[in-house]
């Protein structure tokens, strides 16, 4: 079967991508690790001894980076609807975060109000239609935010992928009502044509 022009272009861009090459050279599972690293370098989000949850973790770039920063201490739980190869000192849940039984499995692992940091790089399968994709993406952000409000300890932090579009301003407003500091970041590793950004919320207020 012949590849479409768009898929050929994507593959060419992918293999020419400086972050893809860097990830391969440095032993990381995905280029996405550099999005988290850039933000963490500025904000010092991840430290040894923390309790951290990583949503939308597969193939494991963010989890891999967090595990390295935590140096085998604390607790790191990763969750994804797709399988992920094991990583040192990481507990992995295979399941759909939108399903109640999967959410409960995660809650059972993390005592309430002990979570230091919630990471979420979750995104829906993209259809190419903003009218479909943005609401799906915002729903995942809302679920992550609800989980954070239930589980974060006072002063805890959250970093979630969020797409510009309908509902964006309302979610930012909601975050500002619950956290001391809220900023929007677009790391240099994010593709320029992508609508993705990252909402960083620090200092959770009960």
UniProtKB/Swiss-Prot annotation:
Pfam families: FtsJ. Its EC number is 2.1.1.166. One of its GO terms (cellular component) is cytoplasm. It is found in: Cytoplasm. The active site is at 161 (proton acceptor). It catalyses: uridine(2552) in 23S rRNA + S-adenosyl-L-methionine = 2'-O-methyluridine(2552) in 23S rRNA + S-adenosyl-L-homocysteine + H(+). It is an enzyme of class 2 (transferase). Keywords: Cytoplasm, Methyltransferase, rRNA processing, S-adenosyl-L-methionine, Transferase. S-adenosyl-L-methionine binds at residues 60, 62, 80, 96, 121. InterPro entries: RNA_methyltr_RlmE, RNA_MeTrfase_FtsJ_dom, rRNA-MeTfrase_E, SAM-dependent_MTases_sf. One of its GO terms (molecular function) is rRNA (uridine-2'-O-)-methyltransferase activity. The keyword Transferase applies. SUPFAM superfamilies: S-adenosyl-L-methionine-dependent methyltransferases. HAMAP family: RNA_methyltr_E. Specifically methylates the uridine in position 2552 of 23S rRNA at the 2'-O position of the ribose in the fully assembled 50S ribosomal subunit. Belongs to the class I-like SAM-binding methyltransferase superfamily. RNA methyltransferase RlmE family. This is Ribosomal RNA large subunit methyltransferase E. It comes from Legionella pneumophila subsp. pneumophila (strain Philadelphia 1 / ATCC 33152 / DSM 7513).
